[in-house]
Amino acid sequence: MSVPLLKIGAVLSTMAMVTNWMSQTLPSLVGLNSTVSRAGSSEKITLFQSPEEGWQLYTSAQAPDGKCICTAVIPAQSTCARDGRSRELRQLMEKVQNVSQSMEVLELRTYRDLQYVRSMETLMRSLDARLRTADGSVSAKSFQELKDRMTELLPLSSVLEQYKADTRTIVRLREEVRNLSGNLAAIQEEMGAYGYEDLQQRVMALEARLHACAQKLGCGKLTGVSNPITIRAMGSRFGSWMTDTMAPSADSRVWYMDGYYKGRRVLEFRTLGDFIKGQNFIQHLLPQPWAGTGHVVYNGSLFYNKYQSNVVVKYHFRSRSVLVQRSLPGAGYNNTFPYSWGGFSDMDFMVDESGLWAVYTTNQNAGNIVVSRLDPHTLEVVRSWDTGYPKRSAGEAFMICGVLYVTNSHLAGAKVYFAYFTNTSSYEYTDVPFHNQYSHISMLDYNPRERALYTWNNGHQVLYNVTLFHVISTAGDP
């Protein structure tokens, strides 16, 4: 290999190292890494003030999508105490940006010159090969050709000189970047020592107060029902589907029961996603058939009405056995006092924030809805209320925070029309509309864990989020 070719090889190797340094080492030198990014994100949360600095929770509500919202008053902030350091940090970042732009220019020029060097390398290899094969006698014509070729190589010297200049520039930029990196590290350390930990403590304190807020938001008066969210279209016109109201958040199993009478097959899907896809499920075969669609899953067990009886059955999924069954005194059954849509819906079981409930009717109550609180272990009636609302005029019903909400129809145009408050044994007429998308609701149940209404609507499994009205008193309130 000739000396010029060796020089070009050295230049190419040097430029490869420079390119690698620009793409890998430069970002870490200027501090453009995950640590700096986290610090920047932390600065955004300085709005959260600790209680002793004057902010306070003054309202709380629930968004239309069902999420808990707590509103806090933030005191007016004076000029940031770290303005000097912030300005210095911005100046340093501008310098880093300028350095980065200079490096981009060098990289572009290097790429252009590299293409030229590669073409010259091909020419020099051709000359080297001709010199090696030439004999002792070289004609004047051959000398002229060699001279012409060497003339073509003359511009290469200026390219190499430019490489030398670029190398010096890179060395200078690298030194500047090192200085900037040191300054950034010092600022980062100072802000981390005096700011980030304090911010983290404030955020933790705020999270604790928001958690307390969420606990207080557990109950409230129903003021709105969201638009329907169709999860799946599966099964016949009537049925029920549900999740366990007492399960931990990691347990997202879904139970599916198609039909409204004489059914025994219960499908258990591992997750809501599996339910949507119709996969990963097991089958439970109940020892006694069910009636209606008012079933509920509570703390690992299914509570349902035994077909052609007023018997409540508690079936445990894990042991696949009936733990207890008991007659509900005086309760009508076999389409004696169903909802307006029929379907053997004489007995409807519900769970809210306070426990297990049964909604039904007796002859003694003249067909009016009776609400009974049940002991989930023995199925004994703890207490009962006569709501005075005729069950055959109700489309469906559900419990939220000890309040029974009744719809006036199971068809299109239905709304939540009546509310009975068990804590005061009083009632009121309401006007809370909701969109009955598929025009025939045969199951409507509230899940307190998810604060959502589960609905079976004409063969569609549908969810509704609810809006609850809350009145929250803070520690400073009289």
From Swiss-Prot:
The gene is Olfm2. Residues 86-109, 160-218 form a coiled coil. Glycans are attached at residues 33, 98, 179, 299, 334, 423, 465. Residues 1-16 form the signal peptide. Transmembrane segments: none annotated. Disulfide bonds join 219-401. Keywords: Coiled coil, Cytoplasm, Disulfide bond, Glycoprotein, Membrane, Nucleus, Secreted, Signal, Synapse. Involved in transforming growth factor beta (TGF-beta)-induced smooth muscle differentiation. TGF-beta induces expression and nuclear translocation of OLFM2 where it binds to SRF, causing its dissociation from the transcriptional repressor HEY2/HERP1 and facilitating binding of SRF to target genes. Plays a role in AMPAR complex organization. Is a regulator of vascular smooth-muscle cell (SMC) phenotypic switching, that acts by promoting RUNX2 and inhibiting MYOCD binding to SRF. Its main location: secreted. GO terms for biological process: locomotory behavior; neurotransmitter receptor localization to postsynaptic specialization membrane; positive regulation of smooth muscle cell differentiation; protein secretion; regulation of vascular associated smooth muscle cell dedifferentiation; signal transduction; visual perception. It comes from the Eukaryota. GO terms for cellular component: AMPA glutamate receptor complex; cytoplasm; extracellular region; extracellular space; extrinsic component of postsynaptic density membrane; glutamatergic synapse; nucleoplasm; nucleus. It is found in: Secreted; Synapse; Membrane; Nucleus. Peripherally associated with AMPAR complex. AMPAR complex consists of an inner core made of 4 pore-forming GluA/GRIA proteins (GRIA1, GRIA2, GRIA3 and GRIA4) and 4 major auxiliary subunits arranged in a twofold symmetry. One of the two pairs of distinct binding sites is occupied either by CNIH2, CNIH3 or CACNG2, CACNG3. The other harbors CACNG2, CACNG3, CACNG4, CACNG8 or GSG1L. This inner core of AMPAR complex is complemented by outer core constituents binding directly to the GluA/GRIA proteins at sites distinct from the interaction sites of the inner core constituents. Residues 218-470 form the Olfactomedin-like domain. This is Noelin-2. It comes from Rattus norvegicus (Rat). Expressed in the brain (at protein level). Expressed in carotid arteries and the aorta, mainly in aortic SMCs. Induction: Expression in SMCs and carotid arteries is up-regulated upon injury or by PDGFB. It holds the Pfam family OLF.
